[in-house]
């Protein structure tokens, strides 16, 4: 059975992760691959998804500790993992917006020991390729009431942690360019290099196998 790949795009909120993740999926399709887009947490995956949505966007769970919240994020990833693995084993390229490193960065920025949040997520599936987007936030799309978008100083801490982790793990770091097209081409250059080096098959090649 053909094996796909698991790609993750990281970055602070309001920096264009959704836009560029979806553009990457479109590019992969044009290039003959079989991609699928995911955004973590998986909000429609019960029971943890709707619960996280209510906490992050609707002000529920104010009595939750950060340990409780990060455990809930981890559980959402863990519960969805069988579906994630099935996609990859079927030959799909999964393009995920946010994943474990998001939780590690936010949990650490909010006062948890980095090593503890790392250990919490240790047993989850590891991505094959990660990329960090950096640059200025688009403040006009900031979601009012979202607990992780309303605190600008906290977002700056997260940005610093993500940059440090990118350096530690050797992720490509892409700075936002004046145009979306220019940013996309930088992203595509890194992804294409990874795909060529890893030998992920295109749809026609999978069918011939």
Regions found by a protein language model. Give the residues of each.
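P-loop (Walker A) phosphate-binding loop of NTP-binding proteins
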Residues: 12
């Amino acid at each position: 059975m053909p094996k796909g790949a698991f790609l993750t795009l990281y970055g602070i909120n309001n920096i264009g992760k959704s836009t560029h993740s979806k553009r990457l999926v479109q590019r992969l399709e044009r290039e003959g691959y079989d991609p699928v887009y995911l955004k973590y947490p998986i909000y429609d995956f019960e029971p943890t998804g709707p619960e996280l949505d209510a906490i992050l966007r609707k002000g529920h769970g104010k009595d939750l500790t950060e340990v409780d919240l990060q455990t809930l994020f981890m559980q959402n990833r863990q519960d969805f993992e069988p579906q994630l693995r099935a996609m990859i084993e079927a030959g799909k390229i999964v393009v995920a917006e946010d994943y474990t490193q998001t939780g590690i960065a936010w949990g650490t920025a909010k006062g948890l020991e980095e090593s503890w949040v790392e250990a919490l997520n240790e047993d989850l599936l590891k991505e094959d390729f990660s990329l960090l987007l950096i640059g200025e936030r688009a403040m006009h799309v900031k979601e009012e009431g979202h607990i992780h978008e309303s605190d600008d100083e906290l977002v700056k801490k997260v940005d610093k942690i993500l940059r440090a982790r990118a350096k530690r793990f050797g992720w490509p770091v892409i700075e936002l360019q004046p145009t979306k097209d220019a940013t996309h081409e930088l992203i595509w250059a890194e992804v294409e290099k990874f795909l060529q080096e890893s030998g992920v098959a295109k749809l026609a090649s999978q069918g011939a196998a």
